[in-house]
Amino acid sequence: MNDCWSEAIAERYSLALSDDLRDWFDGDWNRFDCSSEFCDFSVIPSLMDAAPSCFWPGFMLPDTIPIIGNRFGDWLCLKVGNDGKCCEIVHWYHGGGDYIPFGRTLAEALLYDACQSVSPEHQTWGEVSEKDPSKKNILEWIAPRLGVSMAVLEEIVGLYARGHVVEATDRLLEKGWCTTVAARDRIDAALATPLRRKADPKLAMRLGVTWEKEMNRWLFDTDLIPLDQRERLHEILGSSTDGFAQDWDAAEKEARAVLAHRQDLGWAFDIAGWAALRKNQTATAIDWWWQGVQTSVFSDQSTRFRSHWFDRNFGKFAAQQLHELRELLPNDIAMDPYWSALIATEVGDASQRITAHWIGRASQVGLSAGDCYDDWYRAGWDVGCHQVDLFAMILDQLAQNGRQAGWEAKAKIAKTYQARLAQRF
């Protein structure tokens, strides 16, 4: 069987592959063993198909290529830049289409996967795949590509295994590896409480509150728990006062660190804005949320952070928070067409309103092909689009405008998603 696919895949998608990806596609995917969550490397040959079955049109980001699966529907995907190079590896979640960047390179992403797979809350993934004695440990592939010894990687993985998230992520951040997802984990650790680990819909029912709205709101910020319910929770769970303690200052610090380097992830804005509001820094909160509301809803990690208690009519957590502060919004926000589309809750759902907004923007005369591509992208992946016929048009426009902008790789990826959509429907 031919294990060498780098040249064919690079030509198929007009990719400028890095050395580590060339090594991976040229057989390393079939020579190393992985017992972490993402252990299905067998998809590589199928990427040459006209409409690969691993492509999920309308769900996966249209500039990503799935390359490693977890056999439960999630994928590690290459995210491709305008120049055809892989700019990062993202974990795409099939249960909603959310994504989180794992690292700039495949080596970083596989290292983080090894870490998360042994963490106490994630240990069940260790049973996904038995070790193959004929293949090498995946850490042996990662180590030389990150320029360190196996011992360095084993120390970091070991810290995750013992639940020492802060110490483990200290090591990652010192090396500049997996920086975004490390910050995500540090925020999660800062806001984690015994209550979050023990809460479930049955507990909400026992307290006489709704799970989706009220209980998740309390889990997001325990200061929102009414005093009488705190007393009941103490009785039921036997927890101390510390059972509700969160470190919002630490969470804010990590969110701001992410935002200093990138502005495309909704969860960082959500956390930074809420932390500011808690300190009565309303203008700062509004500024963070106005930037955050313009990111994709698929970047918000709302289930992990328990921020999904917002009113779905607004489409996003940040949108509802801004609406709560609507009397204080500056005129440039209050009069913005995008904001008007978000809050027009009497006109269809958020998906319909926002998709229509971006299609209207993309259809304006005089826009560059690159700007059109960006607007069509947001038409499909701002708050999502639920109409198959519209998605066919969106993907077609992404392919056309990507090609006109000279972004051949993005054009070919969009065309592949379009072919898969036509095959499925």
Task: Give the location of each predicted region.
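Compact, glycine/acidic-enriched structural inserts
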Residues: 88-131
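A surface-exposed partner-binding patch
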Residues: 1-85, 135-425
